[in-house]
Amino acid sequence: MRILITNDDGIAAQGIKILEEIAHKISDDVTVVAPDKERSGMAHSLTLSLPSRLYKHDDRHYSVSGTPSDSVVMGIKEIMKDNPPDLVLSGINHGANLAEDVTYSGTVSAAMEGAIAGIRSIGLSQVYSPDFKNGALSFDTAVSWGEKVIRQLIDSTLPNRTFYNVNFPACENDDVKGIRVVAQGHRDYGRLNVEKGVDPRGKDWYWLALGEAISKDNLNGDLDLSYQNYVTVTPLAPNLTDVASLQPLTDILAK
């Protein structure tokens, strides 16, 4: 099995190194193609108005001066074009990708790009909690559960255009309750904040910052189950159609 690994935290990030170690337990044919620096929050963006640079670190490690989706495209269309990957793994993200996080996430969108190409694809994230080990991000649950989850999803009979969003809970490994397949949850709007300051030349600057929002998650959604110390797996698809609204909207526009 040929595995392509990417992320949105950059090729030097701890999470992608851990994911590579996990991948090598599954296959000895692993190639890493990741952004040359952190590209968090890039969603499914592509670099179309500028050239991209490809940096070869060795035969198995490459970095791209672009987005996570750029990296997947570069891996499939250039680096592995003669032997395309059978599996795309994206992560392990430094922090959760739960609920509406998936719409901003470069990690999840890189997995989406793989799915669009018809390749089995999985995005993986380690949930971060400020209360966990004095704010330190531990990948212990990802290390312990990652291989098992990936192997099970590889064997999935769902179409390859279905991809998976996996989140490992922020708890001690012994406290993980198991794996749950869940729907995408919901966060109340307000997690994004705008920080304002003044630069040395007296001009205003603005910085978007992620905070915590009080959330009334749907029961048994990914937020809810992650908070309960489950490894959550959510099947996603590139098709964003709100199927339940098709007929009501048809009725409205037919008037």
Swiss-Prot record:
Its lineage reads: Bacteria, Pseudomonadati, Pseudomonadota, Alphaproteobacteria, Sphingomonadales
Show the catalytic activity.
a ribonucleoside 5'-phosphate + H2O = a ribonucleoside + phosphate
Enzyme class of the recorded protein, top EC level: hydrolase
Could you tell me where this protein is found in the cell? Cytoplasm
Query: Would you tell me the protein name for this molecule?
Result: 5'-nucleotidase SurE
Q: Which PANTHER family match?
A: 5'-NUCLEOTIDASE SURE (PTHR30457), 5'_3'-NUCLEOTIDASE SURE (PTHR30457:SF12)
- Which Gene Ontology CC terms are recorded? cytoplasm
Q: Which residues bind a divalent metal cation?
A: 8-9, 40, 93
The gene coding this protein: surE
| InterPro entries per record | SurE (IPR030048), SurE-like_Pase/nucleotidase (IPR002828), SurE-like_sf (IPR036523)
Pfam families xrefs: SurE
The record's similarity note reads: Belongs to the SurE nucleotidase family.
Q: Which GO terms describe its molecular function?
A: 3'-nucleotidase activity; 5'-nucleotidase activity; exopolyphosphatase activity; metal ion binding; nucleotide binding
Sections of the chain in a coiled coil: none
Q: Which cofactor does it need?
A: a divalent metal cation
Question: What's this chain's function?
Answer: Nucleotidase that shows phosphatase activity on nucleoside 5'-monophosphates.
> Which keywords annotate this record?
Cytoplasm, Hydrolase, Metal-binding, Nucleotide-binding
Q: What is its EC number?
A: 3.1.3.5
Cofactor info, note text? Binds 1 divalent metal cation per subunit.
